[in-house]
Design a protein with these regions (language model features):
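A short beta-alpha structural unit
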Residues: 193, 317-324
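A cytosolic small-molecule/anion-sensing beta-strand core signal
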Residues: 220
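Nucleotide-binding motor/catalytic cores of P-loop/tubulin-like NTPases across gene-expression machines
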Residues: 226, 321, 325-373
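Extended, folded domain segments that form the structural surfaces/walls around functional sites
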Residues: 10, 174, 208, 297, ...
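Active-site lining segments that contact anionic ligands and/or coordinate catalytic metals
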Residues: 213, 302, 314-318, 340, ...
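Nucleotide/phosphate-binding catalytic cleft detector across ATP-hydrolyzing
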Residues: 1-15, 19-206, 223-225, 234, ...
């Protein structure tokens, strides 16, 4: 692909990050600038105060423009929240021509058939991602164009979102003079940043533990298989600390980041009492016990969101933890103990992307960098993602028309 400047906004509960990159190819991406500011006006992926959210997004975009030296006119925007739902659906069409040769228009027809699902009122399709194709009900294929058959099937992962929730987010971005070029489900982006191709092929669960939500994605056979959003994440850990130790919320957040450890017995360097500022202190063990308890609960919630209880068959590569809360000391070890299968911390792999190194390998910015990777690889028509446009393009176009009316 030709050199192109692309931008994206990761809109979270605790931070908003705008990233600008020079994309020369899917494996040659230079990050030019990132604007990171505290998030206000959002909760669990949903806009709850339009003016506050708009102000935070404005500040983040301005910082990214200043650092990169580039003007941001359009962006990809990450979408998450409890309103996200998903299912797998199959589409089937016949190949009517005498030569039985599968052509590009046949892929469009079968994908259209797969998208023909009943969507609840107030929701729209966000993504319709082909997982694999079959010809005549036989072997699975990734690229059937040019092959011969009488019947073409596609197994598709369908993701829907609340129209009002997405509309409010798009409106915030549009109101500062920036176009929304595309909407991307955040766990899809995070998966691009932290998962290896082997993990996606063999089967893996990814949990992006952010501030307000834990975004779940299961990958199998090289593509997305299951997605879910859990409204429990880092915010709830901080809230537990504040309530349990009688601390202001901002002090509890600093305590969590500075001393949070789910395996405190392994760290003999910490004093019995830890302090942060303004005379606030707490028992180190009490602090860590609170963090550990909430994380144990979260692991159980992750299992409840799985489509099967046969976890080893579903995900032989285990669980990959990413997001800011994944930086808690000892979290992967706790996960192994609770879940009884492989767990690792998922830092961005940094493959094919370079530039501002302080975020490129930080789990807290997996979604941020992943939004750029998703667009770069999507343009190259990677095996597990559908190209921008179609139903998703109409979703964005609908909002543009509404806001200009």
């Amino acid at each position: 692909m030709a050199k192109k400047i692309v931008s994206a906004i990761d809109v979270g509960t605790t931070k908003i990050a705008t990233i600008v990159a020079n994309v020369r190819s899917q494996d040659d991406i230079e990050v030019l600038g990132v604007g990171v500011v505290p998030s206000h006006g959002l909760h669990k992926g949903i806009v709850v105060n339009m003016e506050e959210a708009k102000a935070s997004i404005t500040e983040s975009v301005r910082d990214a423009q200043r650092i990169s030296g580039m003007r941001i006119d359009s962006v990809n925007v990450g979408v998450t929240g409890r309103h996200i739902t998903s299912l797998n659906n199959r589409g089937v069409v016949s190949i009517p021509r005498d030569d039985r040769l599968v052509r590009p228009q046949d892929l469009k027809r079968v994908l259209s058939a797969a998208r023909s699902v009943s969507v609840p009122e107030g929701k729209r399709l966000l993504h319709a991602i082909p997982r694999y194709y079959t010809l005549n009900g036989e072997e699975r294929v990734k690229k059937p164009v040019g092959m011969h058959g009488t019947r073409l099937d596609v197994e598709t992962h369908i993701i829907t979102a609340s129209v009002s929730s997405v509309q409010n987010l798009v409106k915030c971005v549009h109101s500062i003079g920036v176009e929304v070029e595309d909407l991307i489900l955040e766990p899809l982006a995070a998966g691009e940043a932290v998962l290896t191709q082997q993990e996606r092929e063999s089967g893996v669960i990814m949990a992006d533990i952010g501030g307000g939500t834990t975004d779940i994605a299961v990958f199998r056979d090289g593509s997305i298989y299951h997605t879910a959003i859990i409204p429990v994440a880092g915010y709830q850990v901080t809230s537990d600390i504040a309530i349990g130790l009688g601390l202001p919320f901002n002090i509890a957040e600093k305590m969590k980041k500075g001393y949070g450890n789910v395996t405190p017995g392994l760290d003999t360097s910490k004093a019995d009492e830890v302090g942060i500022e303004n005379g606030h202190s707490a028992s180190y063990r009490d602090l860590c016990d609170i963090v550990r308890s909430r994380m144990e609960e979260l692991f159980e919630l992750i299992l409840l969101e799985m489509p099967t209880t046969d976890y080893q068959t579903l995900a032989p590569c285990g669980l990959v933890l990413t997001g800011g809360t994944a930086n808690l000391t000892g979290l992967a070890e706790l996960g192994k103990s609770v879940l009884r299968f492989q767990v690792r911390k998922g830092q961005p792999l940094g493959v094919g992307i370079y530039g501002i190194t302080d975020i490129l390998y930080d789990a807290a910015y997996a979604t941020t960098t992943g939004l750029i990777l998703w667009q770069a690889r999507n343009k190259e028509r990677s095996a597990w993602q559908v190209k921008r446009g179609g139903i998703l393009g109409s979703f964005v176009s609908l909002f543009r028309r509404l806001f200009r009316a």
